[in-house]
Amino acid sequence: MDYLHQETISFEQAVCWIDKFVDEIEGNRNGLEPYPIALRGINWIKFLSKYHPYILAENKRKWDSSLYAQYQILLDNLEYHLLGNHLLEDAFSLLWAGLYFKDEPIYQKAKGLLLRELEEQLLPDGAHYEQSPMYHCILLDRLLDCYNVSVNNLRFIGQEGLNERLREKAGGMLGHLASVVYKDNTIPLLNDSAEGIAPSPTQLFAYAKRLDMDWEKLPMGACGYRKLMAGHWEAIVDVGDIRASYQPGHSHADTFNYELRIGGKPF
């Protein structure tokens, strides 16, 4: 979904890719599912904003029209059937759409959904409730992006209050991440986590610092993880309940699992 922003992709290639997608959209059933729309929408908005001076007016009108129509599909198909990170990604993307199109109904829908889902999905110790360190990093990156775009694009009355809430929730997620990482700042590969998918903790901490955020390590509690350290030994143990109880999609296989590192290497 971030194809447009890869360092090896030229501006011309990106333009061709967007044009091709728009021209073939009627036959692209999978591309019009809500989750792809949510991820693609943010990436298109980033591209359109970054390269605005170089995009032909005709292309801009064509792409904006398609993107707005895609967001109408998303609004009509929010992922309440999946909940979890999918619904949160929908809300993040709608915030970008509301700000980009200066569309208050979309913004208000995003705001309400964001405030509710952040309260529901972030635990008191700052962890995302699906207990996957990788997805925690993905969602933290998205939350930092949303705070960044919202604080720099004030469009609507009361938006500052939303920004403060986004900042507060990001601080909690940063505090949890600071506690759960190993000494080398890598994440434990529990609950569907893998390397090279999400931004690294080092990248996320640096991004948060650029946004002038501060945070403190938060003790691990509700997340169900516990860290044991002695000399060259580091262990992360998953002793918590399956969360979320109504959406165990990412904690289905790792309950009571653990990772052990000795001298910085997996045992």
Across the structure, where does each feature detected by a protein language model lie?
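Carbohydrate-active enzyme catalytic cores, enriched for enzymes
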Residues: A127-F267
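Aromatic-lined, polymer-binding surfaces characteristic
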Residues: M1-A170
